[in-house]
């Protein structure tokens, strides 16, 4: 296996624990990502290959990949190697993992998508690579061209590597818009020019330069640029060309003649882009430039076959993907009889749209629009598979939450717009009118005024009224100088400050009256109003100084000047919790903390390697400060000692803005030059507070005052307004205050993405009155008893909109005329069924169905079913009414599920359960009566199936909380809890489980057990914050408190006490708290149990004594003896092994324990593999077997396990479970052999059932699918790149995914490095 090469040296040595670090993971977790839109500047900015497509923002390329299980595309990676505008992208035709991209800094990059790294780079090209393309006839050759040429050919590797100039393609008379290689004819290439002409080069033929200009331009020097150009994939000589004004032509490159000129329906329409449809010969699609109309054409017709309006804004570029095969249902087609009787079934033609005889080919078009919108349109089904309506296409300089709504985030961008996003759905809610130049900074009006002030590079400042959608005020005091920062005073809503490159910080009222102009010796970059004094403002200046001004006096001199930075100061920020404290970030790479009252710099934070931009104080923890830098990182600081607590590497470029909302103080948003906005959860930084809340500790251990909290070594305490407000509200309550406390703190500490939704559902289940549900409840996942009610009222509100259809039909063939005549005769003869079948043959289903009841209701129903089957076969939405009319709920639900429309499926299944759909009782087999209850039963099962599928979809997308919501919505509490635990949302699981009570108890207890394991290591989680020893002791107590919340807790408490490494006195204290005998008594109890030959008790008490290592040989020999017998089961040996694994780490690592330790690791590895099979942790089963085999091979041990047997067992498991593990494109299925079946059957006999049903299946933490990007790690378990959160092992180098770490730790407590150190990723 790949991973062994990484860590095999661990298995060689026996002194590996020397110099080990602590295993760790980032405390700051990425929980949301808002991708940029597609840039509108350059032509070839979207591309596709196989099951991936990509598009370019200005500085980053976004790559989406098909998830075969759900048949949907997901963001897979972000490439941000370019530092200047990207000009073009081209996918390699020979290798689906490679693409080439160019940028305006004369750079071409070859990037490998699978490995997410640069394969080759061509620097300082002659001229800007404005257009580029892989050569079709050579493996690794890329051609690129600047605006005027020549064409450069770059051979990337091999003996001929280097750049040469194409021998003919140079000295053009007009700039090049684009060029295209012929896909079959070697070396044939066409260029489109700004003057409307084409140049064609074909080796061995005469070169044709500047030919085929549109006829209207002949003899003039007017320009009509070529906007699109594509060779016909089925011809050697034909190509489609589009000119901006002249439109579309099909031309012949050999005879240099125009074959067809295509006509658009109106003179106003013009085409922006085009693409051939590979699955339909002769068919192509175009996108209009003014409005988002997609037109479908066939070369045989000069007018479009169909016109689909997809969006208000015009197209920018198009690319057609060959669709992946859909999951289809098998529907039996009618048997084809050799003779035709009056009642035999007709074979219908494919359905035709109203106006023409054609069916859209299967295929997906990647559509990019001028407003940055990107979508994937399914042409066959005529629906969006995915659409991101609009996005920033450039660097985002600033982001801020709306003061009165933590769900709305505003962003300001280089692209000249401010956009407001709903962070729960990551969709744009409002966008400013635009054309403002570059917007560097924004500031919300205080309270609910619903206005945003923006500062721009050339056009002064403005106020945008978000609701009205218009600019209501402009400020031009700085002239055309750039405004780097704008700050609306939150204590006095009439004042706005701006600072500019002209050296002034100007304070004015919102109606434009200037109050102060503070002159600085150089440009001013940052300003911030004090949170405690409405008249104090601080500025950051290019002269390296920070100044503080007092606005209440008329003086224009600063009160204080702080010097110390060695380069320009950018942002300054006042602490919200500590009066007189402010911080500043500088180009010298440091952050300085200043104390206004002491006139001094009280701390310097060193760590960034480039200028610092974003700065943010936490609004609850007074010493927590976060900074973002041009070194692409975000750093979290404890300003008490000036230590860096965490560094986040996920952004792919400079980090500019950081923000959080006081009512969600541990959710942070960041924005960057990589043109993404990312959401982060900082909750892990305050884990002790969270657990104090769960354990119902006193308020003193949750909320504190600032002076106490900033003492070094103090555990984190909440000191902000929000926590104080919650406390006040709770102290007012008389009843169920614990429930409210858990809910309110949970909502404050959890990131967006479903926790509010989850709590609403918990309230519904606990019987809360519907009138208390919040306004937005119906937007989320509703409890099923509300689903139909809310959807019905929604339907009444919606009014119908008439859609206009473009006309155009084809003459009807003669055969159809004859059939119609025949049908009329049959009808007059009373042969209704024959008439109906002929109508079916003509495709006139509606006529057939309207007459069919004249034959019989049974025949009508059968005809309806045939129609439904045909529509499903063709994947048409029209099937829905047919299925509903005949009550065929199952077919409809399966249809929706196969298309991934899980929410639709859920709605139908619920309607059926509520009895809104009547199955037609037509004919019943003799003696059987199908009661309504049985139908109800059927529908209920269907409902659960759909809910489960929807939950699974959310879950594998890294949205465990929403997955839990799906289960709560149908009252499935057990599964809802299981999904929270599998998503590692342990604190949330305990909160919700505590409120839900009895029905959630088993899962709540398991979550408490895992949380206690987390607590056991909290001092390890915070190695850098320097918590003192008493704090570690506090955490042992905290773990004990959690375990005491579990009714049957003795064994859990024993494990906790066994693992605790203190002095005897501390250990006895803990024993006392856990109601266990003292260390000395345990020693005697162990000796007694040993004399009685009671293995479990002996092991238990030795572990609790001063000499826990005595337990090892006793426990291990018991397990070895058991495994040697043939009929052992997991449940007999696992309890002993599990207990042994809690031996104190420093005792286990003693040299005298080497052999026992190695045997314990091997047994835990093997039993871990079996547990992983039982829990269906497919991704780590092979690694656990491999780990056990490696230890067996490399360590001196005598264990009744053979490497050969382990590999047979693994092969048997693979063979017998491959049908469930196979993904669509894997190798062909080979059935398991008889011996493999026998081995696997024995294995299953040993495993028995998992006691907690719901927790079977892999773990997926929140954000598992989000691409990180400057930070790529290879998993030492799989050898593959880790997507999502990473967990570093104790050597500080080896990494595994957090998901794998969680699953591993649940089945085998010891690290995969074989060191004997416990793994704690919780």
UniProtKB/Swiss-Prot annotation:
Region named Disordered: 328-352
PROSITE patterns per UniProt: WD_REPEATS_1, WD_REPEATS_2, WD_REPEATS_REGION
WD repeats: 81-121, 123-164, 171-211, 221-261, 266-307, 391-431, 434-474, 478-518, 519-559, 564-604, 607-647, 650-690
InterPro entries registered for this protein in UniProt: G-protein_beta_WD-40_rep, Quinoprotein_ADH-like_sf, WD40/YVTN_repeat-like_dom_sf, WD40_repeat_CS, WD40_repeat_dom_sf, WD40_rpt
Bias kind Polar residues: ranges: 330-345
Keywords, sorted A to Z: Repeat, WD repeat
Name under which the protein is recorded: WD repeat-containing protein 17
